[in-house]
UniProtKB/Swiss-Prot annotation:
It comes from Salmonella arizonae (strain ATCC BAA-731 / CDC346-86 / RSK2980). GO terms for molecular function: succinate dehydrogenase activity. One of its GO terms (cellular component) is fumarate reductase complex. This is Fumarate reductase subunit D. NCBIfam families: PRK05470.1-1.
Amino acid sequence: MINPNPKRSDEPVFWGLFGAGGMWGAIIAPVIVLLVGIMLPLGLFPGDALSFERVLTFAQSFIGRVFLFLMIVLPLWCGLHRMHHAMHDLKIHVPAGKWVFYGLAAILTVVTAIGVITL
């Protein structure tokens, strides 16, 4: 018999954030590390393409704030989701693990939002 009131799961929301964070961490983050962490210190950029003033102006623009927010938050959700499931796979039972890991991710998301808004 089909249950007319199936139990809804919140897992798709967390899987969506995990997937978005994984894709961001695989595609966007390595490019930023290459540009800012390797090429910039070696002086491989023309002139002041990434001068402090230009980077600060970008970071204080709307699109820059959104980019910084996503650059921090999406990999954060991915990592904490991975840690939550790794603890389960290793049979290390964290009391209220879903609340601990996803709650920490939510708190850090709010902290990041406040930090990016006040930049």
